[in-house]
């Protein structure tokens, strides 16, 4: 089980990403289309003024059951350990153990 503080920190990051996503995307689009180096410098400064945790690449996928940060399957949002347990118990519809 992950520390509660780490799980809460990830939730806070998710909220910040949601809050600033439109502004960040608008600034990045303006940065891509602008030709003037001075304007690009100003836009870059504005992007840097945004909160650091509002960048989407600061987020970490976590298991929604245990909060484990590594070994998380995107399709289920579960860590490999929980996925294995639940699959063996038949709690994941359509998931079967492979054999050949």
Curated annotation (Swiss-Prot):
One of its GO terms (biological process) is translation. Keywords: Ribonucleoprotein, Ribosomal protein, RNA-binding, rRNA-binding. GO terms for cellular component: cytoplasm; small ribosomal subunit. PROSITE patterns: RIBOSOMAL_S14 (PS00527). It holds the Pfam family Ribosomal_S14. InterPro entries: Ribosomal_uS14 (IPR001209), Ribosomal_uS14_bac/plastid (IPR023036), Ribosomal_uS14_CS (IPR018271). GO terms for molecular function: rRNA binding; structural constituent of ribosome. PANTHER family: 30S RIBOSOMAL PROTEIN S14, SMALL RIBOSOMAL SUBUNIT PROTEIN US14M. Binds 16S rRNA, required for the assembly of 30S particles and may also be responsible for determining the conformation of the 16S rRNA at the A site. Part of the 30S ribosomal subunit. Contacts proteins S3 and S10. Belongs to the universal ribosomal protein uS14 family. NCBIfam families: PRK08881.1. This is Small ribosomal subunit protein uS14. It comes from Trichormus variabilis (strain ATCC 29413 / PCC 7937).
């Amino acid at each position: 089980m992950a520390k509660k503080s780490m799980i809460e920190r990830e939730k806070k990051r998710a909220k910040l990403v949601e809050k600033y996503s439109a502004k960040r995307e608008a600034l990045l689009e303006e940065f891509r289309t602008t030709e003037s180096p001075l304007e690009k410098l100003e836009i870059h400064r504005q992007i840097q003024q945004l909160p650091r945790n509002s960048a989407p690449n600061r987020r970490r996928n976590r298991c929604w059951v245990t909060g484990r940060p590594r070994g998380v399957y995107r399709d289920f949002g579960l860590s490999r350990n929980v996925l294995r347990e639940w699959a063996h118990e038949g709690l994941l519809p359509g998931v079967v153990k492979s054999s050949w």
